[in-house]
């Protein structure tokens, strides 16, 4: 008899960083019309891993589809994994953050129905209306912390 296991989801969060006038900057997009955290600044190019696709391939695909930039999967560098149990629907997610250093093209809004704009923000001066993903995972990515857990919209303290 085969035992069924719960279903989990995987999402990728490309992290695009650059040096700006005020130090390191991160590229964020303003969510709209998605039904999830609309009106919040979120990691630009984030999305789900599709069937028969690796996480690196998904990050490269999402960058192409949502930002119009070309990224080779070999240039996608692992930064952080967050095991997240969503407070809203109880879904379990494995959120993978990847550093994107090398890409071709200029980040552009490719899905204006879901993305109200792109903007580079100094990591030391993020807007107040950031997504829970940015709030939870960006500090880990910047500090070199490879793993975290998030349960019902709160970080798990060990």
Task: Please place each PLM-identified region on the residue numbering.
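Conserved Nudix-box catalytic region and its N-terminal flanking loop in Nudix hydrolases
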Residues: 24-65
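Active-site-adjacent beta-strand/loop module that shapes the phosphate/pyrophosphate-binding cleft
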Residues: 9, 20, 82-107, 140-141
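Short loop segments at secondary-structure junctions
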Residues: 18-22, 32, 101-106, 123-125
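Charged phosphate-binding loop/patch that engages nucleotide di/tri-phosphates or the phosphate backbone
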Residues: 139-158
